[in-house]
Amino acid sequence: MSSSRPSQSSTTSSRSKHSARIIAQTSIDAKLHADFEESGDSFDYSSSVRVTNVAEGEQRPKSDKVTTAYLHQIQKGKFIQPFGCLLALDEKTLKVIAFSENAPEMLTMVSHAVPSVGEHPVLGIGIDIRTIFTGPSGAALQKALGFGEVSLLNPVLVHCKNSGKPFYAIVHRVTGSLIIDFEPVKPYEVPMTAAGALQSYKLAAKAITRLQSLPSGSMERLCDTMVQEVFELTGYDRVMGYKFHDDDHGEVVSEITKPGLEPYLGLHYPATDIPQAARFLFMKNKVRMICDCRAKHVKVVQDEKLPFDLTLCGSTLRAPHYCHLQYMENMNSIASLVMAVVVNDGDEEGESSDSSQSQKRKRLWGLVVSHNTTPRFAPFPLRYACEFLAQVFAILVNKELELENQFLEKNILRTQTLLCDMLMRDAPLGIVSQSPNIMDLIKCDGAALLYKNKIHRLGMNPSDFQLHDIVSWLCEYHTDSTGLSTDSLYDAGFPGALALGDAVCGMAAVRISDKDWLFWYRSHTAAEVRWGGAKHEPGEKDDGRKMHPRSSFKGFLEVVKTRSIPWKDYEMDRIHSLQLILRNAFKDADAVNSNTISIHTKLNDLKIDGMQELEAVTAEMVRLIETASVPIFAVDVDGQVNGWNTKVAELTGLPVDEAIGKHLLTLVEDSSVDTVNKMLELALQGQEERNVEFEIKTHGPSRDSSPISLIVNACASKDVRDSVVGVCFIAQDITGQKSIMDKFTRIEGDYRAIIQNPHPLIPPIFGTDQFGWCSEWNSAMTMLTGWRRDDVMDKMLLGEVFGTQAACCRLKNQEAFVNFGVILNNAITGQESEKIPFGFFARYGKYVECLLCVSKRLDKEGAVTGLFCFLQLASHELQQALHVQRLSEQTALKRLKVLAYIRRQIRNPLSGIIFSRKMLEGTSLGEEQKNILHTSAQCQRQLDKILDDTDLDSIIEGYLDLEMLEFKLHEVLVASISQVMMKSNGKNIMISNDMVEDLLNETLYGDSPRLQQVLANFLLVSVNSTPSGGKLSISGKLTKDRIGESVQLALLEFRIRHTGGGVPEELLSQMFGSEADASEEGISLLVSRKLVKLMNGEVQYLREAGRSTFIISVELAVATKSS
């Protein structure tokens, strides 16, 4: 199927198309920028923004030159903002190779308040930077500049030698040089004396805690909360959440302003408003600040001998371009602070230890934009806190996007049901004439079916002439395609697109046959866009030449007025599914029978393969649990212990035979009862808790010992129908570790003897001081990671020791890095962490999974001097048990997926059977043939009911709604017996119908398909239990009981007698028991008995000499003549 625009799927081809669009958009950005530079005051923004349709051809060479010049200017501009100064250094000699023109005045001017002796340094090309600052400042700067990940140490606090003024030195490395921004420390600030990560976090701690506490499931709530927190944190006049759409245009999705400011919520902007080059810079430099758009820029003087132009991409001081400054001033924004929101681009994580393979592809999802109506400066600690907050926000956005994808996957299952429902009724006209119809399939403004040269319409549609014109165009220009999807018929080249107007801009069309088509239509995008700000006042008119929000919004509407909202991938999947089903809807009965046989074969194969695989996994699971060296125990739904392995018996002193049958809450310490009770309740509801700590009592000789401390994972035990039948606990004994930790925290003197003790009970421990430098690394950590103490000491714990790039212990991705930072910073501020899952790659590539516990380290006065981090590792046996558990879950999931697939696939041949039956009904048939067709219809209705039974619990627990249908008992009985005739003939069993004629002709009210299902199930079990050559009979009696004047109850009793030894006791106990351990046949009997109970009836089974009888009683209503 062809498409006029590139899709946004995660495949390589779509990425190449996406890259091509970015390149094309960059050329458009460059052209717009060149027009602005050349036109000066005569620049017309509204007309220039519509450059998307400029032909390439002969203008391409010029366009390439314009683009190259534009990118050079964006990345290698030679001006900075005046709120600070800049130096560029040679990385080897630390001598100045470039400086801003205001640097000599800011850094070397003599202050009369600071006495000085000797010559004053003069700032210029070639000067050693260490001569400009005090001795300690020069040493701190030299240490930082020699650091691998230099940005981790930002900011470095330095003092000028001449004036004594404090500055934050913010360093970043570019090719061939070091760039340093110097920002004055304001008099009201408390100077930050060390690396900023742990210090800056305190500013954003409240906001991060609030974001992380939000319930998932609402992107709008998440964005609104983020905007609110940034508004309170920064104090700017306006804060907006800005999202990029698939076609790169932007939308304000959340906003908060101070009173009196015009809102921009809901405004859409063309992609050119934030150029691709600027977006690239946001990916590199996550926070961007403009202090005063009216301030005069300062030139950067560069050593003329340098063989390259300096790039200022990573500098906060980098001056914005004049077109952006005009845009800001026109929207009454003098200062801005912008944070990038960078999320995963949909790739799966690699499992390789190679960092390039294990990182996800990133994309710029949007921006958090702060504006101020007056000049405003945000100091570096606040900007760093904002960057950290934006990283946490990006992780949460990513999770919301994953939830949305899961929701879409669930919609696929719903769609399959919807499609089948459509085709079960009068295909194909039922998909437009009944409800639900094809407009319910996807979001659209109109749809049409062209079938046998007749048009069937829904919603907005072209005229007959226009639609036939579209079909002719498709047949001529898209001959080899099965259809077309486009968000702009005009851009796709349809000659009559403009005549269709705004009502039909986008179209998805699929070919069903040579002459039959399906169409969906969408109106132009502007119809979906809502202006969220104040309306124009009477007589007020925008200046379309200027760059500001109203002109951008107008420009956006101009660009999209012939375009609709794009068709999403999942929408096209639905369309393709309907197309394929319609194509196959009219296959002959032979094809239907072939499909049915194929499905039965798959079911049988699945049963055999699945049971063998499940038995093998179960046997291995039991062996591992019994022999595991970790405590494993289990309870049933009532909390009674039904599993207690050797290890937990050894730890507690309670033998297996004594533990079985006891309630779990009687075995745990009183202080842990509430914790365990909560775990049980959540697990039985399907919510499995992990890494929960509780204590369990000791018994026998160990009764007087301390209780056993466990870290426990709870998982729900489920049967083959995915019903929860108990809870399994996989634990880790931490009694020894806890005693060590308790002793450790009480130590006031020299703790090093404990930390560095190589005793196996000492867990892996590492630590950091209050500034983020690694200060502890015990021998257990060396054994675990492969890195010696000397390799990591005095390195930044966040970034150098644990990080995502060149760190000693590489974390899996950026999300893990940010979460680790949050854990450490929470602990510094007093929020000590529970056992948290943690993972990293050790020195030689092995991935280590463990639990992390972080505690703050205090001095004698109680002040925080750093952190201690303890790692807890799972034993080999526990890891193997968890691996087998995952295999078991994967096997169950595989079975469920295959069963769900087969259940859906049954619908298609079933619709073919129905169609064939309806065709036969229209022919001349004899009375006997009509009766056979009627029996077939009865069986089909029963099958429909069973396929709709997705929730067995509702039947078993008695919540199913029964239908009230009028039926003759004769019809139900014939359909039920027909379902066992093949089996009985194979065993040469004679079935006799001993019902009296009057009873068979009785007309009743009730759920006839369910009654038919019940009788067929009991007949089948009876046939299975009857020996070959035996006999089976069915008889019944009816008792009427009048209630009132018009209603009569029918108390109906069926007796199914069969010869032989009878139904096995085990099967009968399953019928009268629960579904927990029932076999497939037992489940069938149990469901049948529950259905009988829903009909106010009961089932009995009598054994006699040489024969047995099922007695089934139900309560129905008699259909009176007056009714």
From Swiss-Prot:
<dbReference type="InterPro" id="IPR035965">
    <property type="entry name" value="PAS-like_dom_sf"/>
</dbReference>
<keyword id="KW-0600">Photoreceptor protein</keyword>
<dbReference type="InterPro" id="IPR012129">
    <property type="entry name" value="Phytochrome_A-E"/>
</dbReference>
<dbReference type="GO" id="GO:0009585">
    <property type="term" value="P:red, far-red light phototransduction"/>
</dbReference>
<dbReference type="Pfam" id="PF02518">
    <property type="entry name" value="HATPase_c"/>
</dbReference>
<dbReference type="GO" id="GO:0006355">
    <property type="term" value="P:regulation of DNA-templated transcription"/>
</dbReference>
<dbReference type="Pfam" id="PF00512">
    <property type="entry name" value="HisKA"/>
</dbReference>
<feature type="compositionally biased region" description="Low complexity">
    <location>
        <begin position="1"/>
        <end position="14"/>
    </location>
</feature>
<dbReference type="GO" id="GO:0042803">
    <property type="term" value="F:protein homodimerization activity"/>
</dbReference>
<dbReference type="InterPro" id="IPR016132">
    <property type="entry name" value="Phyto_chromo_attachment"/>
</dbReference>
<protein>
    <recommendedName>
        <fullName>Phytochrome A</fullName>
    </recommendedName>
</protein>
<dbReference type="InterPro" id="IPR013767">
    <property type="entry name" value="PAS_fold"/>
</dbReference>
<dbReference type="GO" id="GO:0009881">
    <property type="term" value="F:photoreceptor activity"/>
</dbReference>
<keyword id="KW-0805">Transcription regulation</keyword>
<feature type="domain" description="Histidine kinase">
    <location>
        <begin position="901"/>
        <end position="1118"/>
    </location>
</feature>
<feature type="domain" description="GAF">
    <location>
        <begin position="218"/>
        <end position="401"/>
    </location>
</feature>
<feature type="domain" description="PAS 2">
    <location>
        <begin position="747"/>
        <end position="821"/>
    </location>
</feature>
<dbReference type="InterPro" id="IPR000700">
    <property type="entry name" value="PAS-assoc_C"/>
</dbReference>
<dbReference type="InterPro" id="IPR003018">
    <property type="entry name" value="GAF"/>
</dbReference>
<dbReference type="Pfam" id="PF08446">
    <property type="entry name" value="PAS_2"/>
</dbReference>
<comment type="similarity">
    <text>Belongs to the phytochrome family.</text>
</comment>
<comment type="subunit">
    <text>Homodimer.</text>
</comment>
<dbReference type="GO" id="GO:0000155">
    <property type="term" value="F:phosphorelay sensor kinase activity"/>
</dbReference>
<dbReference type="InterPro" id="IPR036890">
    <property type="entry name" value="HATPase_C_sf"/>
</dbReference>
<dbReference type="Pfam" id="PF00360">
    <property type="entry name" value="PHY"/>
</dbReference>
<dbReference type="InterPro" id="IPR001294">
    <property type="entry name" value="Phytochrome"/>
</dbReference>
<dbReference type="InterPro" id="IPR029016">
    <property type="entry name" value="GAF-like_dom_sf"/>
</dbReference>
<keyword id="KW-0804">Transcription</keyword>
<dbReference type="InterPro" id="IPR013515">
    <property type="entry name" value="Phytochrome_cen-reg"/>
</dbReference>
<dbReference type="InterPro" id="IPR000014">
    <property type="entry name" value="PAS"/>
</dbReference>
<keyword id="KW-0157">Chromophore</keyword>
<dbReference type="InterPro" id="IPR013516">
    <property type="entry name" value="Phyto_chromo_BS"/>
</dbReference>
<dbReference type="GO" id="GO:0009584">
    <property type="term" value="P:detection of visible light"/>
</dbReference>
<feature type="binding site" description="covalent">
    <location>
        <position position="323"/>
    </location>
    <ligand>
        <name>phytochromobilin</name>
    </ligand>
</feature>
<feature type="domain" description="PAS 1">
    <location>
        <begin position="617"/>
        <end position="687"/>
    </location>
</feature>
<keyword id="KW-0716">Sensory transduction</keyword>
<dbReference type="InterPro" id="IPR005467">
    <property type="entry name" value="His_kinase_dom"/>
</dbReference>
<comment type="function">
    <text>Regulatory photoreceptor which exists in two forms that are reversibly interconvertible by light: the Pr form that absorbs maximally in the red region of the spectrum and the Pfr form that absorbs maximally in the far-red region. Photoconversion of Pr to Pfr induces an array of morphogenic responses, whereas reconversion of Pfr to Pr cancels the induction of those responses. Pfr controls the expression of a number of nuclear genes including those encoding the small subunit of ribulose-bisphosphate carboxylase, chlorophyll A/B binding protein, protochlorophyllide reductase, rRNA, etc.</text>
</comment>
<keyword id="KW-0677">Repeat</keyword>
<dbReference type="GO" id="GO:0005634">
    <property type="term" value="C:nucleus"/>
</dbReference>
<feature type="region of interest" description="Disordered">
    <location>
        <begin position="1"/>
        <end position="20"/>
    </location>
</feature>
<keyword id="KW-0675">Receptor</keyword>
